[in-house]
UniProtKB/Swiss-Prot annotation:
This is Esculentin-2SE. Mast cell degranulating peptide. Causes histamine release from rat peritoneal mast cells in vitro. Has antibacterial activity against the Gram-negative bacterium E.coli K12 and Gram-positive bacterium M.luteus NCT C2665. It comes from the Eukaryota. One of its GO terms (biological process) is positive regulation of mast cell degranulation. Disulfide bonds join C31-C37. The lineage of its organism: Eukaryota, Metazoa, Chordata, Craniata, Vertebrata. InterPro entries: Antimicrobial_frog_2. The keyword Disulfide bond applies. One of its GO terms (cellular component) is extracellular region.
Amino acid sequence: GFFSLIKGVAKIATKGLAKNLGKMGLDLVGCKISKEC
């Protein structure tokens, strides 16, 4: 029902957020290694 729909959207949102945070983390590590911050 409605609640499961919200749970599904929340799950997708968390996945997207985790992916974005992971990408940002990788970018930060890469810039620290190459000293191009």
